[in-house]
Amino acid sequence: MTVLAVLLMLQGAAVPPYLVFPDSTLDDPAAYEGYSARLYHDSRGNSVETYIDGKTGRIVHLWADALNESIGFTVRNSGGQKAAAAVAFDRGPAAAWSSGGRRSLRYALTVRGTVQIGQFILGSMRIERDFGYAGRVHDPIDAPPFVPQEFTAFVQRMDGVYRQRLTPSIRLESTARDWTLRVSQPSLDARNHLWLSLHGDGRTTRATVTNGVLTIQVRGAQPASVSVEIATDGAALAPLNRRQIFSADFRRFADSAKSPRLEREIRGFELLSSKQKLMAGLPTYATYFGRDMLMTALLMEAVWSDTMPEFVMGAALAKLGPDGDVSHEEALGGQAIRENVAEFLRTGDTTLLRNLQRTRENYWMIDDDFQLPVVAGHYFANASVPEDRKHAFLQRWGAALRKNLAYVARQAAPYAQNPVATSLVSFKRDADGYCHPGSWRDSRVGYAGGCYAFDVNVVWVPQALAAIVAIDSVLRDIGEPGVEQIADVRRAAQVWQGSARHFMVGLDSATIETRVRAKLASLPTEERAHWDSVLERAALHLDTLRFPAVSLDSTGQPIPVMTTDPGMWLLLERQDSSVEREILRPFLLPYPIGLFIDGVGLAVANDAYATPAVWDMYARDLYHSPRVVWGREVNVLLAALATRHRPGAIDSVRTAVARSGLQYAELWSYKFEGGALRPVRYGSASDVQLWTLTDLAVQYLLNTRK
C-alpha cells in the first residue's frame, strides 16, 4: 500500500470497494478491454461508482444520490491528442466522510510518464452520458467545454448571472512540496455544487495548467500516485440493506451457498436499493425507471421480502400521469434543469424559472402502464401479506392504483370491441411519424420500425387485464370496493387471450433456407464463414419454423424478426405442452436459424427472416440486434424454465452464457478475430443492473427446485 493510500485512510473512514469490475475470480478481464470500475458506499450509504475506460482515458464518478450526479475527466498521455493514458486505480481503500453539508470521497490513481487531464464535466450523469453518446471524448483534450445546447441558449436569453455557471472553475495551487488542482461547478440555478480535487506529491510529480488542461510529469520511471477527491452538497437517498430487501429463506440459502457470485449480486442489489426507489443501473441509469422496477418485482418474487412490492408500487404510483399512465423515467437535478430550461425556451413560461429543479417525468413508454397492474395483482393475491397491510396500502395508494387500472382498461377497450390487428395497443408517434419504440427494446430500431409490439400486446395487456380481475376479487373479499366496470374488463380479458395470432410467423423449409442464406451472403467474409460452419455442424433440416414477430407494422402485418420476448410469455402464462415446445424451440436452435450462440448466449434478436432494410437497421444500431445478448432475457427464460421440467434447455443456456465470461453483465456482444468468435463487453453496459441481478431469483429457483 502506498504512503498516499495510508494518508487517505487517516483523513476519513476507510471504505474498501463494495464491488470491483472486472473480478478475476468471476469475470474474463480480457472481455472488458481495458475497462475497470470500483463501487463504494459514501458516508450516508449512497452508492458511488468510479470507472476508467481504458480505450478513451475517460474517468467518471457517478454519485447515485437524489440528484444522479457525476464528475468526469479525461486522461491522455503525451503520445498525442487522442492517445489514452496509462492510468489505473491505486491499491488500498478509499476514504469517505461528511462535513459542513458536504459528502466527500477520496481515492488514489496511479499515472506514468507525462499525462494531460482535461474535459472536466461536473453535473448530471445524463450530461456525462450525452457527452459520450456525442463522441466528444475523442475531441482534443483542450477542446471547448461540453455544454448542453439548452444551457447555451438559455444564457443567451437571460442575464449574465447564469453564464459563469456554464463551465467549471479550474485552479492550480502548487508548491515545492505538493500541488492541488481544484475544480468546482454550481448547478445552473446555484442550488447545488460539485467539487473535484486532484492532489500530487511535488517530489514525484510536477503539475502545470494551460487552457484548462492539467499536465502531470512523473519524475522517474516508476508510476506515481495522484489522489482524487470528489464532494457534493446534493441530497442523499435512504438506502435499504439486504435484510430489508430479501426474504429470510433466501438469506439462509445465500449464506449456506457461500457463493462469491451470489454475494456480488446481493451487494449489487443493495447498491441500487433505497426507500425512495430502485435504481435501474450503475453507472448510467442511477435513477427511477418504471419498467425496470416493475419487471424486477415480478422476477424477484421468490427471493425478496413481501414489503418490497409496496416500495416498488408506491414509487410508480407517486409518479402517475394525469390519465393514470406510469412514468418511465424521472429527470432530477441537472437533467431536470435542462428539461425545464428547454420548455421555457420553447414556451416562454416564466413560472418554470421559480424551480428549475422541479422533477420531470417521461410518459412516452407504454409497457410499464400495463406492468403495474400485474405487480399489484401478484401483491394482492399473496396470502402471506396480512390484510391490514393491504388495507394500509390502499389507504395511501388506492386512488392512484384505481386510476391506473382504469387507464389500462381504456387502452385495452378498442381491441376488445373490434379484435383486429390495427386495434391493438400501438406505440406513440414521434414528430416525424415514426412509431416510437415504447417498450423495453427502446432503441430506435428495437422493434424494427413496428407500431404494435408483441411483448406489449401478447404479454402485458392480457396479463394486466387478468390482474385487474384478480385485484377486484381480492378487494371485495377484504371488504374494499371493487374495480369499476369489472364486467367490461372480464370480457376484454377473454378477447385479448387471442392476440398472439396476429404475430405468428410460419416458414417452410425452402423459405428458411433462402432467407438464412441471403442474410449470410450480406455479411463480411470472416463472419459468413463462421456461421456457415455453425450450420454445417448443426446439419439441421427443418420442415417448418414458427415464431412470434417482434412487432407488426402500421398496417398490422408481422415484421418477421425472431426475438427473446416470448420468454416473458412463458414465465407469466402457463401454456399447454405443444405451445410451450413451439415457443421454446427458437431459443435452442443455433443462430442464424434460431437465437442460440454457443459460447455467448441467446441473441436478443434474429433478423435473418426479415428484409435487407431491417438488416441495415440493426447493423447501424447494435443495441437490440443479433450482435447482443441481454442478461435480463437470459434470466427471464431461465426463471421460466425453472418452473418446468426442462433440465436440458437450462443446462444448454447456462453453459453458453457461462463460457462468455460476461454472464454478470447487463448485456454483451461478440466480435470475430482470426475467424473465431470472441465475446466482448458491450460499450454502454451497466456494471450493476437491476434486470441482470434477477439472476439471484434464477439461482434460488434452480437450486431449490431440484
What residue ranges belong to the model's regions?
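Terminal accessory carbohydrate-recognition/targeting modules of carbohydrate-active enzymes
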Residues: T2-L10, A14-E265, K275-L294, L298-E310, ...
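Long, acidic, intrinsically disordered low-complexity segments
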Residues: L214-F253, V312, K390-A416, L572-L588
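Extended glycan-interaction surfaces of carbohydrate-active proteins
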Residues: F246-Y285, D325-T350, P414-C451, G498-V629, ...
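Aromatic-rich carbohydrate-recognition surfaces in CAZymes
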Residues: A286-P419, V458, V628-R654, Q689-T704
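Short, surface-exposed loop/turn motifs at beta-strand boundaries within globular domains
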Residues: F289-R291, F454, M562
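Extended, well-ordered alpha-helical scaffold segments
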Residues: S305-K319, V385-A412, V474-A539, V579-L595, ...
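Extended, well-ordered alpha-helical segments in internal regulatory regions
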Residues: A376-Y379, W460-R476, P566-E580, V636-H645
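Aromatic- and glycine-enriched pocket-lining scaffold segments that form the walls
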Residues: L394-H436, A448-R476, Q485, V489-A493
